[in-house]
C-alpha cells in the first residue's frame, strides 16, 4: 500500500465543494479520505462522498464531494491510499 495527498482545499462554513482527479489506472484499488488541517474540538468537521467515472477502458476519474459540517471555514487535505 502507498498513500499521498492529491490536493489541499478550503471550505467556508457549511459549504460543499466538488473536486475531480483523473488518469488513475482502472486496475488499482484506490481509497479516498479527507483530513482536516484546521484543528477544532468537539464534533466532526467534514464529510465526503466519492463517485467514479470509467473514463476509458484503462483509466478512472474520481469525483469527490466534500461537505463542511461546521459554521467555520475548514482547511483540509484530499488524501488517497492505493491498496496492493
What is each residue range found by the language model?
Residues 1-84:
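Extracellular attachment/recognition segments
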